[in-house]
Regions:
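Phosphate/dinucleotide-binding and metal-coordinating scaffold of catalytic cores
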Residues: 1-189
């Protein structure tokens, strides 16, 4: 997504240094790390139509042109992961809202929401989840940002790292099982 955005802004992605790319991530990335000076390509836009953003994500996944590239990048283009997502604020609360990928069924959001409710009923502590409404599917899965903690003194960023990133694995290639994840957890805690 970043490379497409750079090309749209007449910049060659191959000529950017690692520091240039970190400046583009700026303060929009997941976790506690932020990068200064920040370089931004897009303006703030509070008009978030989830169905339209999901449609634009599908166009990009199918390597088609999207006229919402700036907005999609600003809302979550640095977050990575297996599925397209946005990071947005709704009613003064920070949320991650996920859209379906090419390999998903059209009601993946509802299924993930149901699993989150099941996990909570089983006693698993996790961030608040919500099924955001849609006119084209059963809804989009949302989870309150788990890399932010809010209290009376404000919002603090929380360090986080995925197992795939820590082990330098391709998240698209299944290579971990629970035994490895438990060993990793024991090593780092």
């Amino acid at each position: 997504l970043l490379n497409r955005l750079l090309r749209e802004h007449k910049q060659d992605p191959d000529k950017l240094t690692v520091l240039d790319r970190l400046a583009i991530v700026g303060k929009s990335g997941m976790g506690a790390l932020t990068y200064y000076p920040e370089q931004s390509f897009s303006e703030e836009n509070d008009n978030t139509d989830l169905d339209e953003l999901a449609f634009q994500c599908q166009k990009i996944l199918h390597t088609e042109y999207s006229d919402k590239l700036d907005e999609l990048y600003r809302l979550g283009g640095t977050s990575g992961g297996a599925r397209p997502k946005i990071m947005t604020t709704i009613n003064d609360e920070d949320w991650i809202i996920k859209f379906s990928a090419n390999v998903d069924g059209e009601n993946e959001g509802k299924m993930e929401y149901d699993y989150s409710c099941c996990a909570r009923k089983c006693g698993i502590t996790m961030s608040e989840t919500k099924l955001f409404p849609s006119e084209v599917c059963e809804g989009y899965f949302g989870i309150k940002r788990f890399d932010r903690i809010s209290d009376i003194s404000g919002t603090k960023r929380v360090h986080m790292l995925t197992a795939a990133a820590l082990l330098e694995l391709d998240f698209e290639q299944p290579s971990l099982d629970y035994h490895i994840l438990m060993k990793l957890t024991k090593i780092i805690t």
